């Protein structure tokens, strides 16, 4: 996971 709104797959919400 990352510090922003990205999931493990890298898709941004």
From Swiss-Prot:
Primary location: membrane
Post-translational modification: This peptide displays a high degree of glycan microheterogeneity resulting mainly from a variable number of mannose residues in each glycan. Both N-linked and O-linked glycans are high mannose.
Membrane topology reported for the UniProt record: Lipid-anchor; GPI-anchor
One GO CC term on file: plasma membrane
Lineage top rank: taxon: Eukaryota
Glycan-carrying positions: 4, 7, 9, 11
Residues covalently joined to lipid (GPI-anchor amidated aspartate): 13
Keywords noted in UniProt: Cell membrane, Glycoprotein, GPI-anchor, Lipoprotein, Membrane, Phosphoprotein
Compartments it resides in: Cell membrane
Record-given protein name: GPI-anchored glycoprotein NETNES
Organism: Trypanosoma cruzi
